[in-house]
Amino acid sequence: MVNIPKTRNTYCKGKGCRKHTIHKVTQYKSGRASLFAQGKRRYDRKQSGYGGQTKQVFHKKAKTTKKIVLKLECTVCKTKKQLPLKRCKHIELGGEKKQKGQALQF
């Protein structure tokens, strides 16, 4: 499990800032797929009517994790940027910090 603080002091390249400022950290989440994207319209048109599945359904999934992407929002000018991290299975935002010599708690 990766523990990431909810705020991060990093460079902001917004017009108002162009310096290091505090950024609010959230995890990126993909939006809902549009029904009106060209590929989706073409696919739906092809699928309609008789004839079953017309395009191959992908089954050979190779990866077990996804890359974590952080969304950073500047607290001064509200400029947003994304920061990809390494792959991990679990992510925790703003969890408690580990301390040396502490017993494990479950």
UniProtKB/Swiss-Prot annotation:
Keyword Ribonucleoprotein among record annotations: yes
Molecular function per GO: structural constituent of ribosome
GO cellular component: ribonucleoprotein complex; ribosome
Record Pfam families: Ribosomal_L44 (PF00935)
Key words, A-Z: Antibiotic resistance, Cycloheximide resistance, Ribonucleoprotein, Ribosomal protein
InterPro entries: Ribosomal_eL44, Ribosomal_LSU_eL42, Ribosomal_zn-bd
GO biological process: response to antibiotic; response to cycloheximide; translation
Signal peptide: none
Stated family: Belongs to the eukaryotic ribosomal protein eL42 family.
Taxonomy, superkingdom: Eukaryota
Keyword Magnesium (UniProt): no
Descriptive protein name: Large ribosomal subunit protein eL42Q
Note: Confers resistance to cycloheximide, an inhibitor of polypeptide elongation.
Species for this entry: Candida maltosa
